[in-house]
Swiss-Prot record:
It comes from Homo sapiens. This is Olfactory receptor 2M2. Disulfide bonds join 97-189. Keywords: Cell membrane, Disulfide bond, G-protein coupled receptor, Glycoprotein, Membrane, Olfaction, Receptor, Sensory transduction, Transducer, Transmembrane, Transmembrane helix. The keyword Phosphoprotein does not apply.
Length: 347
């Protein structure tokens, strides 16, 4: 019972990845800059697709969902890391830790399934173009995206509930910059071997099964492209699919390396570096990859800048919504700082 009380009443200590030496301070602000670029890039991508009616297609709807997931993913981990670094505090409550685990696992899992849906969408568009409007109509596309969110959230709920069931009787220092599930397994007093097997199976479902769909889809796409008689058609198909393949390679490469290995093989330093790439760099690169290689997205962005034919109200809507998102981010970022200042004032 004492252990259970400790589980709910004590905070965890996030050791983080930066100290206050000049090199680490520079790296911290570099990561913070990457976070802001990722936040703005994914916000712009979501808003462009929402506001520009020419982008209201299944492919761009799925892309907007990917950007939304990336946006939520970086907001799950980086603001708390930044607050702890700037305030000098390293603690996080049990509820906060479970919340991070739930959103991190849910969003990561949802992205896995969504990337598989996006690969299937490209397969239908290239291999069955005449049936595309029937096989990928808005209703079917919406259902696939919804199931991606649901399946990812299911895994997040499993991990969050499991965290509450663990007892933590020893050290509460998490060798990471956020609450990640493998790091908590190491701290638990319970025998976690059975649960590690369950997590491994969940990872197989979340990672390997979507990868199989992606490989099967693009194998058919490659065969279809090879048999295309038009060089222009091949170039267009390659351009359409290459952006998605680059994102898949970055995302699944880091995820497979991170979660398929046994817990005993995890190195704290190695895990931190992979997590930085997985949670911050990839969300920053995704909108850049899709926008730089996509004429429709580039056209929509140029329309916003007023360098093309545009609807007069479009820029105004974008700026208002983007400002609202940025204000929301700042509110989240400084929420804990205000509480800290109030406590210090009272003391």
């Amino acid at each position: 019972m004492a252990w259970e009380n400790q589980t709910f009443n004590s905070d965890f200590i996030l050791l983080g990845i930066f100290n206050h030496s000049p090199p680490h301070t520079f790296l911290f602000f570099l990561v913070l800059g990457i976070f802001l670029v990722a936040f703005m890039g994914n916000s712009v991508m979501v808003l462009l697709i929402y506001l520009d009616t020419q982008l209201h297609t299944p492919m761009y709807f799925l892309l907007s969902q990917l950007s939304l997931m990336d946006l939520m993913l970086i907001c799950t981990t980086v603001p708390k890391m930044a607050f702890n670094y700037l305030s000098g505090s390293k603690s996080i409550s049990m509820a906060g830790c479970v919340t991070q685990i739930f959103f991190y696992i849910s969003l990561s899992g949802s992205e896995c399934f969504l990337l598989a849906v996006m690969a299937y969408d490209r397969y239908i568009a290239i291999c069955h173009p005449l049936r595309y409007t029937n096989l990928m109509n808005p209703k079917i596309c919406g259902l696939m995206a919804t199931f991606s969110w649901i399946l990812g959230s299911t895994d997040g709920i499993i991990d969050a509930v499991a965290t509450f069931s663990f007892s933590f009787c020893g050290s509460r220092e998490i060798a990471h910059f956020f609450c990640e599930f493998p790091s908590l397994l190491i701290l638990s007093c319970n025998d976690t071997s059975i649960f590690e097997e369950v997590i491994f199976i969940c990872c197989i479902v979340m990672l390997v099964f979507p990868v199989a769909i992606i490989i099967a889809s693009y194998a058919r796409v490659i065969l279809a492209v090879i048999h295309m008689g038009s060089g222009e058609g091949r170039c267009k198909a390659f351009t359409t699919c290459s952006s998605h393949l680059m994102v898949v390679g970055m995302y699944y490469g880091a995820a497979l390396f991170m979660y398929i290995r046994p817990t005993s093989d995890h190195s704290p330093t190695q895990d931190k570096m992979v997590s930085v790439f997985y949670t911050i760099l990839t969300p920053m690169l995704n909108p850049l990859i899709y926008s730089l290689r996509n004429k429709e997205v580039t056209r929509a962005f140029m329309k916003i800048l007023g360098k093309g034919k545009s609807e007069s109200e479009l820029p105004h809507k974008l700026y208002v919504l983007l400002f609202a998102k940025f204000f929301f981010l700042i509110s989240i970022f400084f929420y804990d700082v205000k509480i800290l200042a109030l406590i210090m004032y009272i003391a």
